[in-house]
Amino acid sequence: RMKAGTADTVPFGFFKKSIFDTIGLFDERLVRAQDYEFNRRIIKSGGTVWLNPEIQVVYYNQPTLWLFLKKQLLHEAPYNAYMWYLAPYTFVFRHAVTGIFFLGILSGSILSFYFTWIKWLFFSVITLYTMLALIASIRQALRYKHIIHLFALPASFFLFHFLHGFGLVCGISKLLFGRAPVQKHDEPWEAAGRVRSFQVHNR
């Protein structure tokens, strides 16, 4: 069971009004990940983000797997890259794992034809990933008492990790080639003024 305590971010957080006067508003340049950037800004400024598992919310997810994956590919993943660009203090390694996964699958699939040691390394990593995905799927199948999880989740895990990684790499590529929809010189919110200096001086 999840315990109450400090966290690096929380979904649907409640904030004291005074915090907005101290560190500013949500960064409107970020279509996605606004809440994560704001929570990280709170921590960077010396504040605390507190997770209370007793608070319950009703969340309506995407109605189909395809819409969920499409959202990850076109919005969530690229905006992780844009967020790092605008606010480097938000970077954590776990958000980059899917990008590494995607590049590993892509490069491993190609290089395995030319190097034997890469073929065996690639095979070992894929085998480990498959085993971990199956273990997680078995746990969820037992938890929710639906055997369909045993078959659907491994494929869903792979599709999510691969497409999210692809979207992340695309976001980084757009930044490198100057085609990203975000710019540092744009105001993060209307009349950001002096508060905006936080993002400039806390990189």
Per-region residue spans from a language model:
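Catalytic donor/gating beta->alpha subdomain of glycosyltransferases that bind UDP-sugars
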Residues: 27-91
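A cross-family signal for key residues in well-ordered alpha-helices
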Residues: 21, 40, 44, 103
